[in-house]
C-alpha cells in the first residue's frame, strides 16, 4: 500500500469534515433556520429541509453520469479538485448571508452541499486504488476517524467567532481549513489512466454507460440488494445529521456555544466508533457491522422522541456518535468489497445516487411533519426511525459482505 497516498486521502476527510460539521450539521444549519428564516411554526425546518433535499437531488441526478465520465476519460482528479474548489467558494460566500436573506442563503446552501457531496463521489472511488480488499475496512475507518478529528478542529476554530457573534468569520475560517487540508490529496492521490476516451466522447457515452451500469447492478443480486438497503437507511442517517443541531437548539434550548460543544463530543464518540469497528469490519464483515449499527440507530431516534432535558440529550448524542462512525465506514467498505474491478468510480456514483436521492425524502419528511405539527420536531424525528427499520430488513437479504475478499462480477 502507498502510505503517502493513504495519508493524503485521510487528510481530505479531515478537510471536508469542516464543511459537514460547521455548515451542514451545526452553525450554518441553525443560523439559517433560526436567524435567517426564523423557525416560527416550523418555517426554518421547512426551508432547511428544502436546502438539503434540492442539493441531494442534484447529486443524485449527476453523480452516476459524472462517475462514468471520470472512468472513461480518466478525469477523476480534475472533477475532484473542481467540485472541492466550488464547495470552498460557496462556504466563504456564506459570510454574506444576513437575517432575512432566505433565498441567497438557500442558493449558497444548495450549491455548497451539492459540490461537497459531488467531490465525495470521486474521493470514495479512490479507496479500491489505495488498499486491497483485506485492508479496505480499516483504511475506510481511518479516513472517517481523521474526518471526525477534522470536525472537532473546525468547530474549535469557529467557536471564538460564534461567541463574538461574528458568523461571517466562522464561515471564512471553515473555508480556509477546507482548502488547506485538501491540497495533499490533490497532489498525492494516484492519477487514473488518462486519455482513454476524449472528454466529449465520454460525455456522449456517459448516459448509455449509466444505463448499462444499472443493468449490470441488477444482474448482481447482492450489489442490488445492498444499494437498495443503503438507499433507505442512509436517508435516515443524513436526515438526523441535517436536523440534530436544529432540534437541539429549537426543542431543547441549546445555545450556539453549547451546540458546538455537543457536536464536538459527538465527533469524539464517532471517532472512537470508527476506530473501534475498523478491524471488526474486516474480521466480521461489513454486513454484520452495518446491521448492528442500524439496530442502534433505530433505538436512538425512538429515545430522542422522549428526551426532555439537555442532559438526556447529551447522553443520547454520545451513543449516536459511536453508531455514526461505524455505519458510515462499514457501508463504504461494503461497497468497495462488492465493486467489480474497473467499475469503482461509476459504482460509487450509484452509491452516492442511492444515499443522496434517498436524502431528498428524509429532510422533506422531517421538515413537512414539523411544519404541519406547528413546529413540533419530536414527531419529525420519530418518523425517521422507519428508515432504519426498513433498511435493516432489506440488508438482511444480502448474503455477501462477510469475510470473502470481493464478489466476482458476472
Q: Language-model segments: what does each one mean?
A:
Residues 1-7, 192-228:
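Juxtamembrane intracellular "pre-TM" segments in multi-pass secondary transporters
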Residues 61-75, 272-286, 370:
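Helix-to-loop junctions at the C-terminal end of transmembrane segments
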Residues 180-188, 382-410:
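Multi-pass alpha-helical transporter architecture, strongest
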Amino acid at each position: 500500500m502507498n502510505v503517502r497516498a493513504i495519508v493524503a486521502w485521510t487528510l481530505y476527510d479531515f478537510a471536508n469534515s469542516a464543511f459537514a460539521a460547521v455548515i451542514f450539521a451545526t452553525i450554518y444549519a441553525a443560523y439559517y433556520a433560526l436567524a435567517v428564516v426564523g423557525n416560527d411554526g416550523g418555517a426554518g425546518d421547512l426551508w432547511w429541509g428544502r436546502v438539503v433535499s434540492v442539493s441531494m437531488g442534484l447529486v443524485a441526478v449527476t453523480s452516476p453520469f459524472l462517475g462514468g465520465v471520470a472512468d472513461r476519460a480518466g478525469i477523476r482528479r480534475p472533477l475532484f479538485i473542481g467540485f472541492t474548489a466550488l464547495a470552498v467558494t460557496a462556504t466563504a460566500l456564506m459570510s454574506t448571508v444576513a437575517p432575512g436573506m432566505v433565498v441567497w442563503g438557500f442558493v449558497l446552501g444548495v450549491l455548497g452541499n451539492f459540490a461537497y457531496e459531488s467531490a465525495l463521489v470521486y474521493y470514495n472511488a479512490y479507496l479500491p486504488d489505495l488498499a486491497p480488499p483485506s485492508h479496505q475496512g480499516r483504511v475506510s475507518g481511518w479516513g472517517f476517524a481523521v474526518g471526525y478529528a477534522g470536525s472537532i478542529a473546525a468547530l474549535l476554530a469557529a467557536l471564538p467567532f460564534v461567541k463574538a457573534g461574528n458568523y461571517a468569520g466562522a464561515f471564512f475560517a471553515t473555508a480556509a481549513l477546507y482548502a488547506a487540508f485538501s491540497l495533499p490529496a490533490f497532489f498525492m492521490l494516484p492519477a487514473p489512466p488518462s486519455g482513454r476516451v476524449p472528454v466529449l466522447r465520454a460525455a456522449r457515452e456517459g448516459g448509455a454507460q449509466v444505463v448499462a451500469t444499472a443493468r449490470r447492478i441488477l444482474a448482481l443480486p447482492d450489489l442490488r440488494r445492498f444499494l437498495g438497503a443503503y438507499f433507505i437507511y442512509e436517508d435516515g442517517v443524513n436526515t438526523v445529521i441535517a436536523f440534530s443541531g436544529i432540534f437541539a437548539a429549537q426543542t431543547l434550548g441549546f445555545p450556539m456555544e453549547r451546540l458546538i460543544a455537543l457536536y464536538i463530543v459527538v465527533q469524539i464518540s464517532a471517532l472512537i466508533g470508527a476506530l473501534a469497528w475498523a478491524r471488526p469490519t474486516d474480521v466480521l464483515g461489513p454486513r454484520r457491522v452495518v446491521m448492528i449499527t442500524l439496530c442502534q440507530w433505530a433505538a436512538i431516534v425512538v429515545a430522542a422522541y422522549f428526551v426532555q432535558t439537555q442532559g438526556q440529550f447529551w447522553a443520547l448524542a454520545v451513543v449516536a456518535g459511536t453508531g455514526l462512525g461505524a455505519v458510515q465506514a462499514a457501508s463504504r467498505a461494503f461497497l468497495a468489497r462488492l465493486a467489480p474491478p474497473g467499475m469503482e468510480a461509476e459504482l460509487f456514483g450509484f452509491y452516492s445516487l442511492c444515499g443522496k436521492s434517498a436524502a431528498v425524502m428524509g429532510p422533506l419528511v422531517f421538515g413537512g411533519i414539523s411544519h404541519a405539527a406547528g413546529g413540533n420536531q419530536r414527531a419529525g424525528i420519530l418518523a425517521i426511525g422507519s428508515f432504519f427499520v426498513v433498511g435493516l430488513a432489506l440488508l438482511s437479504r444480502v448474503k455477501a459482505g462477510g469475510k470473502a475478499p470481493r464478489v466476482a462480477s458476472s
